[in-house]
From Swiss-Prot:
Protein name per the record: Transaldolase
Primary localization class, coarse: cytoplasm
GO biological process, one term: pentose-phosphate shunt
SUPFAM superfamilies (UniProt xref): Aldolase
Organism in which the protein naturally occurs: Sodalis glossinidius (strain morsitans)
Gene name in the database record: tal
Function recorded in the entry: Transaldolase is important for the balance of metabolites in the pentose-phosphate pathway.
Reactions catalysed according to its record: D-sedoheptulose 7-phosphate + D-glyceraldehyde 3-phosphate = D-erythrose 4-phosphate + beta-D-fructose 6-phosphate
Localization of this protein: Cytoplasm
Family, as annotated: Belongs to the transaldolase family. Type 1 subfamily.
Cytoplasm is among the record's keywords: yes
Record keywords: Cytoplasm, Pentose shunt, Schiff base, Transferase
Amino acid sequence: MNQLEGLKQFTTVVADSGDIESIRHYTPQDATTNPSLILKAASLTAYQPLFEDTLAYARKQGGTRETQIINASDKLAVNIGVEILKSVPGRVSTEVDARLSFDRGMCVAKARKLVALYQEQGIDKSRILIKLASTWEGIKAAEELEKEGINCNLTLLFSFAQARACAEAGVYLISPFVGRIYDWYNQRKPLDPYVADEDPGVVSVRKIYDYCKQHRYQTVIMGASFRKVEQILALAGCDRLTISTTLLEELHKADTRVERKLSPSTEGFHQPAPLSEPEFRWEHNQDAMAVDKLAEGIRQFAVDQQSLEDLLAAKL
């Protein structure tokens, strides 16, 4: 048994990719996308028919040029999601424009629009996760959407405060990042020799997982943003792990036995009063790494979103 199959005994494996061929090869349960992956996928030959359909849709909808570009971008993300769903039995995560991360109302409106676009193609909302940045506004938008039956995946999650606020809001799933936390600490003080169990990213996810299970929150914990196979194996047993195709291939080729590292707690603790907005902002602000990486992540996704829109604009 290879490590990928071994990992699947304890954890739901999710493909962090927009490449359909890779997704088919590794047979994950779910798939996650983001503006960076959509931008990369848009250049693949296999997606050209979807790209053309996107442009035709935007032209048909009409409106100003800016409106057409936004409609094309939303439609392309959904078209790729629909195609991915042909190859996974579970769900696909589609991301809300990162530039809306500080506008609760716009996050809700965009999420509803994406769900409607999926439904136009016969995809029920039970197969979709709407990805939102884990800002206070994103978390509150998700709380509202969950009440409408629209499940959300809160991403760019780096601090314990973000995770706790998401759990308290009843968010379906959170994606605490491992690799980007590792990057931040490693750049300041190289983690040498490397010990996976001491990796700050691994430690962060373990703490979040244990807290949510001990306090009986229903939020699914999905570790994300991995740099090394060792990080993945150190979190075997986490509810879900979303993994790049490069690391899926490494796991597929290795046959070392996989041991379960995380298990739900048998203890139960009383849930504390939910964090208020000032408490959330203060607790998050106390984590310099999380402040840096959340801001950077939003900026990076915004740049890739703009690049995608520029690509579409050139064809419209």
